[in-house]
From Swiss-Prot:
Bias (Basic and acidic residues) ranges: 161-172
Residue runs in coiled coils: none
Organism: Gallus gallus
InterPro entries listed in its UniProt record: ARF_GTPase-activating, ARFGAP/RecO, ArfGAP_dom, ArfGAP_dom_sf
Self-association state and partner proteins as the record states: May interact with clathrin heavy chains.
Keyword flag Phosphoprotein: no
Family annotation (CDD domains): ArfGap_SMAP2 (cd08859)
UniProt keyword Zinc-finger present: yes
Reported function: GTPase activating protein. May play a role in clathrin-dependent retrograde transport from early endosomes to the trans-Golgi network.
Ranges of residues in domain Arf-GAP: 13-139
Name of the protein: Stromal membrane-associated protein 2
Transmembrane regions listed in the UniProt entry: none
Lineage of source species: Eukaryota, Metazoa, Chordata, Craniata, Vertebrata
Zinc fingers (C4-type) by residue: 28-51
Length: 428
């Protein structure tokens, strides 16, 4: 290859490259595939490799295919490509193509479309002379053939829309008007409230209404009426001395009067006469009860009693046995106050069996003296607190001979108790 031919090949490649850089030649003329590298120079279109194979099958009398990079081009071939191009050729061969036509994608469909387009000339505008059409300049048809998205649109100048003056005036008035300063609400009540007059002329303040931590003493009178207990002197009313939560804002003299004392509590019980059930457990019967600290020897299953209520409760279960009947055990509950003395009590044992007054027949049974029934109800109620303190003061946890018991004194209610053992007390 001579130097002249080499320079011509380079020049032809430069021309083909410039043609491929145009927007209309960047896509295949038949299937719209991107980046065509083949061309049908007699028709003057750039096509993809798939469409190039179909064009070869049409025959050289219809289409002559060459590669852009691999084949050698002549000046005549380059001139045919410059005269046509994809846009101008489609305007000729696709003049009557339907508007909603969709490009085929499969090989068989593409082949049928190419044959209809170039072989049968189904969509061709036959009124156009091809030779004169080739010599026409591209400027006449490029503008009409270019898609709308590819055309260069002239810049549109928009006029400034003037806002109505009313809105501007209102905005300026809002900016110019000073912001109304609202008073700062003092929640802790540290600052003095600034009174503000209402329409009716009364001074008020937001701080005073919203003061959550105001002094409690201001509302002490209203709280006394609604929350505190009534202080009337009737029989069913509760005295002021029982008010355990005095008002913090009250006077010092009233707070001193409301201190608790024994006399006020006793006077409260003296003014009320409630109905009490006739049970022995409610009466503080004078008794000196001794429970053995160890388990009962006659009945190992009975544990030692560990409760100490000072005359309020008797042993919950008394186990009685008959002389001569070693295997017969009769458990029964003995409430305090109803069993006067165990020594002469006849228990409901079958076959008329009676508990004897001997030391071997009763195991772990404490003597329960008879309660005092001749006391008035008011006096019995007064025992509730005073005698309770006396019992706690006179309690003797450990008596003689290692026996745990209680010692209590009931003034006028019974005889003075003494710390004695269980055996001497029961069978004396």
């Amino acid at each position: 290859m001579t130097g002249k031919s080499v320079r011509d090949v380079e020049r032809y490649q430069a021309v083909l490259g410039s043609l491929l850089s145009e927007e209309e030649n960047k896509y295949c003329a038949d299937c719209q595939a991107k980046g065509p590298r083949w061309a049908s120079w007699n028709i003057g279109v750039f096509i993809c490799i798939r469409c190039a194979g179909i064009h070869r099958n049409l025959g050289v009398h219809i289409s002559r295919v060459k590669s852009v990079n691999l084949d050698q081009w002549t000046q005549e071939q380059i001139q045919c490509m410059q005269e046509m191009g994809n846009g101008k050729a489609n305007r000729l061969y696709e003049a009557f193509l339907p508007e909603n036509f969709r490009r085929p994608q499969t090989d068989q469909a593409v082949e049928g479309f190419i044959r209809d387009k170039y072989e049968k000339k189904k969509y061709m505008d036959r009124s156009i002379d091809i030779n004169t059409f080739r010599k026409e300049k591209d400027d006449k048809w490029k503008k009409s053939n270019e898609p709308v998205s590819e055309r260069k649109l002239e810049p549109i100048v928009f006029e400034k829309v003037k806002m109505p003056q009313k809105k501007e005036e209102t905005q300026q008035s809002r900016k110019s008007s000073p912001k109304s300063t609202e008073p700062v609400i003092d929640l802790l009540g540290l600052d003095a409230p600034v009174p503000s007059t209402l329409t009716n002329g009364r001074p008020c303040s937001l701080e005073k209404d919203l003061d959550l931590f105001a002094s409690v003493g201001l509302n002490s009178d209203s709280r006394k009426v609604s929350g505190s207990m009534p202080t009337s002197g009737s029989a069913g009313s509760v005295p002021e001395n029982l008010n355990l939560f005095p008002e913090p804002g009250g006077k010092g003299e009233e707070a001193g009067k409301k201190q608790l004392s024994k006399d006020s509590i006793l006077s409260l019980y003296g003014s009320q006469t409630p109905q009490l059930p006739a049970q022995g457990a409610m009466f503080m019967a004078p008794a000196q009860m001794a429970y053995p600290a160890a388990a009962y020897t006659s009945f190992p299953g009975v544990p030692p009693s560990s409760s100490m209520m000072g005359g309020m409760m008797a042993p919950s279960v008394g186990v009685m046995a008959q002389h001569g009947a070693a295997g017969m055990v009769t458990p029964m509950a003995i409430p305090a106050g109803y069993v006067g003395n165990v020594q002469a009590a006849v228990i409901g044992v079958p076959n008329g069996m009676m508990a004897a007054q001997q030391a071997g027949y009763v195991a772990g049974m404490a003597a329960v003296p008879q309660p005092v029934y001749g006391v008035q109800p008011a006096q019995q109620l007064q025992w509730n607190i005073t005698q309770m303190t006396q019992q706690m003061a006179g309690m003797n946890f450990y008596g003689a001979n290692g026996v745990m018991g209680y010692g209590q004194s009931m003034g006028g209610g019974g005889a003075q108790g003494s710390n004695q053992s269980l055996s001497t007390q029961l069978w004396k």
